């Protein structure tokens, strides 16, 4: 049965579809986080549309990686940390988890810097922005089920569609775009650096660990696999389409030629994108898109660390458990949450 067949089957109710959809979309929306937006903005500002095609070429790679995590979770009923421990031993599991934690710390610092930058656009001190966000996320996770947290993440992720609006209003020159897409200066070190940066922000360790653990917390089984794969594919396409929109907007508004503008901070990028709209509207739309991706990524990263540490150490871990039933899980979640000092 094909994916479309699975959707059309009389045995597939809307409730079943809703039950299977979610982990793939959430993790892909988290993948369009602050680091991805900055890399895409710099790519468009400096090299125009030359790195645009790469964004769509990465869809199969992104899907294949996340689909493997999905399949492992559904078929084994184990998270990646738990699976590594069972198959390869405690030492390899601890090594993988240590690497993951380092990656997650870096990701959290990136998201917090981006969210602090969004606050600065509107004159809000960084410590207030980060403090409010961390408190809200922790309260949400402690008081909500997996399904509730997932729905909130999906709603926040929808804010990333703002980048599509910016790209559309930047009025890209199609002829110029097609001419630059085929120009690939592969001998230029700066170009290769940005190409590598785009590759690096496409697939990250915490996205793989998250999806495998999320399908378990959501209790997906083999009958859900086809729809869950479709969920992941749609998410991968959405993720790279949003990233491509950022590249297009930066290329259209900043000229996109070698030696072009250098975008090193969130306010700088917001000012550049405001050229596609009015200054005030442009900043609001950009802030909305960036904050949406950063918030989803923050939720995903914190849950990934808590889930994986629980898997490796053998403690129960689920958003379906009350904090008193799973103190280790929520303690890990609190510990990994960034503080306003960050």
Residue ranges and their predicted role:
Residues 63-75, 237-268:
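Extracellular/periplasmic helix-exit of transmembrane alpha-helices
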Residues 157-183, 192-212:
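Hydrophobic alpha-helical segments and their helix-loop junctions in multi-pass secondary transporters
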Residues 1-35, 91, 194, 220-226, ...:
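Membrane-interface "cap" regions at the ends of multi-pass membrane proteins
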């Amino acid at each position: 049965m094909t994916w479309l067949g699975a959707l059309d089957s009389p045995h597939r109710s809307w409730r079943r579809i809703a039950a299977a959809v979610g982990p793939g979309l959430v993790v892909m929306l988290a993948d369009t986080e602050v680091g991805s937006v900055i890399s895409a903005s710099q790519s468009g500002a400096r090299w125009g549309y030359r790195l645009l095609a790469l964004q769509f070429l990465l869809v199969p790679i992104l899907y294949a990686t996340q689909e493997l995590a999905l399949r492992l979770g559904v078929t084994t009923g184990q998270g990646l940390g738990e699976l590594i421990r069972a198959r390869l031993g405690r030492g390899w599991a601890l090594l993988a988890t240590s690497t993951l934690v380092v990656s997650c710390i870096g990701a959290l610092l990136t998201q917090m810097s981006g969210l602090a930058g969004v606050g600065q656009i509107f004159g809000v001190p960084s410590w207030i922005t980060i403090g409010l966000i961390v408190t809200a996320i922790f309260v949400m996770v402690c008081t909500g089920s997996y399904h509730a947290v997932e729905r909130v993440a999906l709603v926040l992720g929808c804010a990333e569609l703002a980048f599509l609006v910016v790209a559309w209003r930047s009025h890209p020159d199609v002829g110029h775009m097609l001419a630059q897409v085929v120009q690939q200066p592969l001998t230029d070190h700066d170009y290769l650096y940005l190409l590598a940066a785009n590759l690096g922000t496409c697939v990250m360790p915490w996205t793989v660990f998250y999806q495998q653990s999320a399908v378990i917390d959501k209790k997906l089984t083999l009958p859900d696999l086809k729809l869950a794969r479709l969920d992941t594919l749609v998410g991968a396409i959405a993720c790279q389409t949003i990233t491509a929109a950022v590249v297009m907007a930066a290329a259209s508004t900043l000229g996109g030629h070698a030696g072009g503008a250098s975008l090193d901070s969130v306010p700088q990028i917001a000012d550049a994108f405001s050229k596609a709209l009015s200054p005030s509207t442009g900043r609001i739309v950009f802030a909305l898109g960036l904050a949406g991706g950063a918030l989803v990524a923050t939720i995903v990263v914190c849950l990934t660390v808590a889930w994986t540490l629980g898997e490796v150490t053998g403690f129960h871990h689920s958003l379906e458990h009350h904090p008193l039933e799973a103190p280790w899980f929520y303690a890990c979640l609190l510990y990994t949450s960034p503080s306003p000092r960050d």
